[in-house]
């Protein structure tokens, strides 16, 4: 679903899949989020986003890739993670629309993550005792620099999915800084149980907003 001048229309597809894999000889997981606008919406703004994240069975980030076509803009972000003692090193690669490639390497003495891996970590949080406004701070790798992000708990809400079922959900906002102001990127609705299954995603995009529902 896509919000265009306050009218919701069926605008494309979005899917999220997490599956077990073997990465560098070890058991791991691969999570992917794919969004694709419909032919109708393509006339106004084409969107083709594919995000992949690899992480260990303990949810330690291993690799991240985002390939995106948003309108006339196309770019690819990649991050490779390596660890030594208490240090985390990220090797970043950014491909621009013009074909220029930028590479950076940084070492941190704290945990860093990426957006998709952070969402998986959220599913393992224990929200017992959380009040509205509770905030978890995250250091997010991606693009050309490290981004300071946060997850804000918005409370609980009953959500109806595309399968017509209703779910009691926890509501969480993923927020980054843009031009020194908070910018909500995604709002997650996950089931209020031990599994925290994603039921709905509200994505706030450059050209409007979109919603994806559990089928």
What are these regions (language model features)?
Residues 77-123:
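Hydrophobic, well-structured mid-protein blocks that either form specific transmembrane helices
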Residues 1-85, 124-215:
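Acidic, serine/threonine-rich low-complexity disordered tracts
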């Amino acid at each position: 679903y896509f919000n265009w001048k306050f009218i919701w229309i069926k605008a494309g597809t979005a899917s999220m899949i997490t599956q077990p894999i073997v990465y560098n000889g070890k058991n791991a997981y691969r999570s992917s989020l794919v969004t694709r606008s419909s032919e109708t919406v393509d006339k106004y703004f084409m969107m083709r986003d594919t995000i992949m994240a690899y992480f260990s069975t303990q949810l330690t980030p291993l690799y991240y890739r985002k390939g995106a076509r948003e309108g006339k803009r196309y770019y690819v972000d990649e991050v490779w993670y390596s660890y030594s003692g208490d240090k985390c090193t990220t090797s970043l690669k950014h491909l621009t629309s013009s074909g220029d490639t930028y590479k950076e390497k940084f070492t941190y003495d704290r945990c860093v993550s990426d957006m998709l891996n952070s969402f998986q970590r959220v599913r393992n949080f224990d929200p017992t005792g959380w009040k509205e406004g509770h905030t978890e701070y995250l250091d997010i790798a991606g693009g050309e620099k490290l981004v300071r992000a946060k997850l804000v708990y918005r409370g609980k809400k009953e959500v109806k999915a595309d399968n017509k079922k209703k779910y009691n959900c926890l509501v969480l906002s993923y927020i980054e800084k843009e031009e020194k102001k908070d910018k909500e990127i995604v709002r997650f609705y996950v089931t209020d149980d031990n599994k925290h299954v994603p039921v709905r995603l509200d994505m706030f995009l450059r050209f409007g907003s979109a919603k994806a529902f559990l089928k």
